[in-house]
From Swiss-Prot:
InterPro entries: ABC_phos-bd_PstS (IPR005673), PBP_domain (IPR024370), Phosphate-bind_PstS (IPR050962)
NCBIfam families to which the protein is assigned, alphabetical: 3a0107s03 (TIGR00975)
Covalent lipidation (N-palmitoyl cysteine), chain numbering: C23
GO function terms (MF aspect): phosphate ion binding
A Pfam family the protein falls into: PBP_like_2
Family classification: Belongs to the PstS family.
Compartment(s): Cell membrane
Protein species of origin: Mycobacterium avium
GO cellular component assignments: ATP-binding cassette (ABC) transporter complex
Protein purpose: Part of the ABC transporter complex PstSACB involved in phosphate import.
Protein residues bound to phosphate: S55, T56, A57, S85, D103, S190, G191, T192
Record's protein name: Phosphate-binding protein PstS 3
Subunit: The complex is composed of two ATP-binding proteins (PstB), two transmembrane proteins (PstC and PstA) and a solute-binding protein (PstS).
Length: 369
């Protein structure tokens, strides 16, 4: 097994990412119930060494998934390069990899390129779910509340100091320093950035005004590459703030803001429970086995205690591969991922895929040829 980040061997972080999957049923509703035992059938065979790349948010989960694949199918493996969602889609469409990992589903233009690459429709299969943390480094500030509008104003430069009245109003009684805010953003094409900006666009009630996309549009701050790059920048910079996939924030022991949502006045911290409540409201907007999620319900939840900044990581696959040996192996890898790959995830801070969604996801996986 090889797990690569930016072409180098991935050093797996000791703290696990939160993997929440509970967003599908026969009626396009979502469920967040507990998963049952992982005994899914794996039909091994095909290409011996698969190659994939993309999302850094799923890099930690991939460790367990690749191990499960190697155990289920001796002599087969997957080499995964965690180089960002944009690269994952580009390399998949360029036939450099066998599938891509992306924190955003394919855009219309990417669908066309993927169909040309595959010679068949491409499918977005959501396998990993995780929250995005707003992390910060301010000496003496161990707790911080933000809402969508205030976060948007920080990340587009409308708020520039930590003791701004807008921040102070959300943190009564907290001594906020009169020091400048240093915004750090992802400077690579990133599904994490896309999802974070979608949250700002939806939850800020017009305060963001920059739109979304895989490149950061805030117009302020300093760039860093990948979740690990932004995490390192925050640790090194007093007065800084950024957005990270949760496992990186945990691994680097970064301070994480609590988020006030449209569902109630209480600020909500990231937890399995708070993210599970959010995912329970997800709907599938894709057709057939293309399991694209409608995530707008994440960003403005109606249930109190829901953490709103959540992304889904998709595996971008061909429905019918030009080389059937590749299709067989990709199917086997994903079968082991939703099967034995789920075992023990909770021990490392992961949440297994609930049965309600696993059955729908498995049906799509089994249809890959």
């Amino acid at each position: 097994m090889k797990l690569n980040r930016f072409g180098a061997v991935l050093s797996v972080l000791s703290a696990g990412a939160l993997v929440l999957s509970g967003c599908g049923s026969d009626n396009n509703g979502a469920g967040a119930g507990a998963a049952g035992s992982s005994s899914s059938k794996v039909s091994c065979g095909g290409k011996k060494a698969l190659k994939a790349s993309g999302s850094t948010a799923q890099a930690n989960a991939m460790t367990r998934f690749v191990n499960a694949f190697e155990q289920a199918c001796p002599g087969q493996t997957l080499n995964y390069t965690a180089n960002g969602s944009g690269a994952g889609i580009s390399e998949f469409n360029g036939k450099q990899t066998d599938f891509g990992g992306s924190d955003s589903p394919l855009a219309p233009s990417e669908y066309a390129a993927a169909q040309q690459r595959c010679g068949s429709p491409a499918w977005n299969l959501p396998v990993v779910f995780g929250p995005i943390a707003i992390t910060y480094n301010v000496a003496g500030l161990n707790s911080l509340n933000l809402d969508g509008a205030t976060a948007a104003k920080i990340f587009n430069g409308a708020i520039t100091t930590w003791n701004d009245p807008g921040i102070q109003a959300l943190n009564p009684g907290v001594a906020l320093p009169a020091e400048p805010i240093h915004v750090v953003f992802r400077n690579d094409e990133s599904g994490t950035t896309d999802n974070f900006q979608k949250y700002l666009d939806a939850a800020a009630d017009g305060a963001w005004g920059k739109g979304a996309g895989k490149t950061f549009k805030g117009g302020v701050g300093e760039g860093a590459k990948g979740n690990d790059g932004t995490s390192a920048a925050i640790k090194a910079t007093e007065g800084s703030i950024t957005y990270n996939e949760w496992s990186f924030a945990q691994a680097q022991k970064l301070n994480m803001a609590k988020i006030i949502t449209s569902a109630g006045p209480d600020a909500v911290a990231i937890s399995a429970d708070s993210v599970g409540k959010t995912i329970a409201g997800a709907k599938i907007s894709g057709q057939g086995n293309d399991l694209v999620l409608d995530t707008l319900s994440f960003y403005k939840p109606t249930q109190a205690g829901s953490y709103p900044i959540v992304l889904a990581t998709y595996e971008i696959v061909c429905s019918k591969y030009p080389d059937p040996q590749v299709g067989t192996a990709v199917k086997a890898f994903l079968q082991s991922t939703v099967g034995a790959g789920q075992n023990g995830l909770a021990d490392n801070g992961y949440i297994p895929i609930p049965d309600a969604f696993k059955s729908r996801l498995s049906a799509a996986i089994n249809a890959i040829t």
